């Protein structure tokens, strides 16, 4: 990596992952993932924030989570057989996102299993942190 270029993350494994990704800037309020889409792309938030939403039976939007810089989304299809996406993901403001197709991810996993292990550790830490935040929020809501 060029010494004059600032890394996108403080985590070396993430920077290596990002070197394989397509990076794009996405405007505010843009739907990145639609429920019903094929699950075929993994995303990483370089900057900005997104909201993960579903629709209830009456068609009302329900926000499941807010994800921020340094978090992945769209990963469920990598680990579970899902024919389609089950939620929408929309940017809350302008975001810089890294994208990698599942086939490309699997190719890199075969070529660099160490990198994938490091990323899996980051993903597990991120999911654990999100779960802890959700647990705290649920407790506050039910006081």
Regions found by a protein language model. Give the residues of each.
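Cyclic-nucleotide recognition modules
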Residues: 65-121, 128
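Short phosphate-coordinating micro-motif centered on Lys-Gly-acidic
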Residues: 32-37
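Glycine- and acidic-residue-biased ligand/ion/polar-headgroup-sensing regions
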Residues: 29, 40-53, 69-70
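Amphipathic, well-packed alpha-helical segments that form the structural scaffold of globular domains
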Residues: 18, 22, 121-124, 128
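Short loop/turn microsegments at loop-to-beta-strand junctions
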Residues: 21, 39-40
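A short beta-strand-loop-beta hairpin characteristic of the jelly-roll/cupin
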Residues: 50-62
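Short, Lys/Arg-enriched, Trp-marked, Pro/Gly-tolerant hinge/linker segments that flank
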Residues: 130-142
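Cyclic nucleotide-binding regulatory module and flanking cytosolic helices
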Residues: 1-31, 77-78, 111
